[in-house]
Amino acid sequence: MIAKVSQINLITKHNIRLHIDCDRIAELMKKASLMVGAGGSMHWERCISSLPALVICVAENQVETTRCLSKENVCKYLGFWDQVSVTDVARALVSLLQSPSKLKAMSKCAGKIVPRHSGTPCVSKHVLSLLQPLPLEQA
């Protein structure tokens, strides 16, 4: 999949770059209009940067938060890594890149989740407000 995705810039007018295990991710995120990545702590980095994302979960503990943020129009959840095809990623990329208004709306929603200079207390409060309480029999 990585080989195919890394060739995408050859067949599109969009400026698409593939970065793996990047040590300058914050710098790249400031310049990006859309990110494809995993869930987990990257969600909060993307939100504080107001960066829309296509998210592919790579661990079970990323799924629920990703679904929740997807419902809030912060990202588009594509699925778990072993269930997402190159075609799925390509279609989602094309859909968003051809709709600047969707990207802008997602960016606004992301920025509301973690406003600049808000820090951990704000993130924690918002995450807790989005989580549904467990029924007593599951607690």
Residue ranges and their predicted role:
Residues 2-139:
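Nucleotide-activated sugar donor-binding and catalytic core shared by glycosyltransferases
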